[in-house]
Amino acid sequence: IEVETDASEFDAARGAHTGCPGRKSHMGTKADKEKEYTVSELIDMGFKHIQWDGSTPVPIIDCFGRIIAVLAGQPEGSYGSELHEAFCFMQKEASDSGLGKKSKEGPHKCGLFPVLLRGVTMGMGNPHPVSLNPKTMTHLLNRLVGHAAVQRMAKYQNSAFGLWAPRIYEEYRNVHDTMHSKLNLPENFPGTIFAAAAFNLG
C-alpha cells in the first residue's frame, strides 16, 4: 500500500524525537475523544478504507518506496485460537483481581480500562534502566507473561519486527543484550528484544 507522504519529512527522521501529547485545540473536547466513529464517517473525514484479510502481511510504503508501517498479519496454524485464548485468560485474570472501570487502577488515559506495565524503563528522569514496579499486581503480571499464548504473540511480533525493520531491530537487540549483560533486570519474553509490555485489561 503506497501513501502520499515522504518519510524523510517525519520529525523522527531528523534525529532524536520525543512525541508530544498534542495541543488541546487539536485534541478536541472530551466528547470528541470518546466518540465512536462509523466507517462511513471516517471516510467522509478523509480516511481511506483498506480491505485486508487480517492474515496476509502488507507493507505500507511512502512515495519513495520506503516501508513506514506494516500490517504484519499472523502465522498459519492455530494462532487465531491462541489469540482468543490469551484474550479470555486476560479477562479472567483481570476479573479475579478486581480490575475494572471502577478499580483504583482504571480507567487509564488510553481508555476506560486499567493498564498494567511489566519490564524495564528509563523514563521519568531515571539516569539508568530500572524495573517497572507493578506493586500489588506482580503475581498477576507474572502469570500473564508466563502464559503460552501471550508468549506466542510476543515471539511473532518479535519475528515480524526483525523481518520488516532489520536495521532498527538490530539496534534494539544490541541495546537489549548490553543492558541485560550488565544489569539484573526482569525479562518478559526471553528470546525477544522487547524491554517492556503493557497489558490493557478492559
Whereabouts are the PLM-identified features?
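Fe(II)/2-oxoglutarate oxygenase catalytic core
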Residues: 1-201
